[in-house]
Amino acid sequence: FLKPSVAGFLLQKIGVIESLLEKFAVGTESIAK
């Protein structure tokens, strides 16, 4: 079973990746226009 600290760390990593993907998507949209 995962420790709470490990789960929190993974969730934080996922959040960072999602924000980077969102910024990348916005960037590609502005380029496509």
Curated annotation (Swiss-Prot):
Entry cofactors: Mg(2+)
Record: residues binding AMP: 13
Molecular function via GO: ATP binding; phosphoglycerate kinase activity
Enzyme type, top EC level: transferase
Binding site for ATP: 13
Catalytic activity annotation: (2R)-3-phosphoglycerate + ATP = (2R)-3-phospho-glyceroyl phosphate + ADP
Keyword line: ATP-binding, Kinase, Nucleotide-binding, Transferase
Enzyme Commission identifier(s): 2.7.2.3
Subunit structure: Monomer.
Family recorded in the similarity comment: Belongs to the phosphoglycerate kinase family.
Designated name of the protein: Phosphoglycerate kinase
